Structures are given as C-alpha cells and as structure tokens.
Design a protein with these regions (language model features):
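Hydrophobic alpha-helical bundle cores within soluble ligand-binding/oligomerization subdomains
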Residues: 1-211
Length: 211
C-alpha cells in the first residue's frame, strides 16, 4: 500500500514512484537524475498547441478539456498507432511529462471561459512536477517548499495501478482491443470524470463556493 511504500523508501516523490511503476523498481540516484532530466526535456507541447487546442472552445468541465488535449496529441505523433512496448513507453513518458501543463492550462482555460484573466507560463526544467504545477498555476508563480511537498505527496497517493478502480480498469479493457495509447488514456479520463469516481471532486469545489 502507499503507506508501506513511504516507510520503506523514505518518502519517494512523484518522479521516483513514476519510475517504480514503469520499471518495477525504485531508481538509484543516478537513474533518478537521468529520469528527471528526461522528463524535463519532454515537458513541452507542439508548436501553437496552446492557441490551436487549449484556447479554442474550452469546455466548462476541466476533465473534458484534458481529455481533448490527450486525444489531440495523436495528431502530432507520427507513430501514434504503433503499440509496441518501446513506443507505448515513449508515448506514456511524453504524456506523464505533459500532464502538469494539461492540468494547469485546462484550469486557466476554464477560468478564462468564465471571464477571468488568462496567464500561461511555460514549465521550468529545474522544477519537479509538483513545483511546476504550483508555479504555472499562480499568477505570481510563487509557492512554498511545504506546498510543493504536500502536492508531491498527494500526486503519489493518487497514482493508480493494477486495475481496482474504474479508470484504471478502463485502460485494461480499452487497450485489450489493440487501440492506440492516446485513445486508451482518453477513455480512462472519461471514466475518471464520472461523479462516482474522480468527478466527485467537483462537488467539493461546489461546497467550498457555497461556503
């Protein structure tokens, strides 16, 4: 379980746990440094993606926005339908690297649709996934070390694997048909959106607004 993982590995962060789930073991310091550098290098979007995809017809639902971004990446991949393990790993590493931008930009596009100001920041290669999310999320790009640590821990606790919940089970079902990575992950996001799964978080936001 997650608590055992934290006790045994001295609180591995998001990047360490990502490596573990992909390759079956926690990385050494050298492997972790190389992995972080690779993730940072891949944390980019195609030219004009923000203009052509993110800012055009933003949805009132952020998960719908993210699903659209994922599926749009199919268009930019010359080997989108190649489901060999090396290619799927490449695609997944790209998506893992890009998800902080997808999440934050979906939030900003959603707020822009509601008439609020828009600001889009590029990720910083020296920052972790959690730090980049906080930096890109806020207008002043400021955050504390404690905030980054808490978010990093939250990202680890939310990392799903195996297939016990609806969205991870969806990936097993959809990928078994032999479809591409982008369609599979988009299907999982569609499942996550449901009010009996990740969509339940929307009710928490509504509760805060009511308060």
């Amino acid at each position: 379980c997650s608590s055992d993982l934290f006790l045994k590995a001295e609180h591995p962060g998001f990047e360490e746990t990502t490596y573990l789930l992909l390759f079956g073991e926690l990385p050494t310091k050298v492997q972790l440094d190389e992995f972080r550098a690779m993730i940072a290098e891949r944390r980019t979007l195609p030219p004009n993606f923000v203009r052509d995809v993110i800012m055009k017809a933003p949805s009132s639902d952020m998960m719908n926005n993210i699903s659209r971004y994922i599926l749009s990446m199919y268009t930019y991949d010359d080997k989108a339908d190649d489901i060999s393990i090396p290619n799927v790993l490449r695609q997944c590493l790209n998506l893992i690297s890009q998800f902080p931008m997808f999440m934050v930009y979906a939030y900003h596009a959603y707020n822009y649709r509601r008439g609020e100001d828009l600001y889009i920041y590029a990720p910083h290669p020296e920052l972790s996934a959690a730090e980049n999310i906080l930096m890109m999320l806020r207008e002043d790009r400021k955050y504390t070390a404690l905030e980054a640590e808490i978010l990093d821990m939250a990202l680890v606790l939310h990392m799903d694997h195996g297939g016990g919940n609806n969205s991870t089970f969806t990936t097993h079902v959809v990928t078994s048909s032999g479809t591409d990575t982008y369609s599979t992950i988009t299907a999982a996001m569609a499942s996550l959106k449901g009010p009996k799964h990740g969509g339940a978080n929307v009710k928490v936001t509504q509760m805060f607004e009511d308060m």
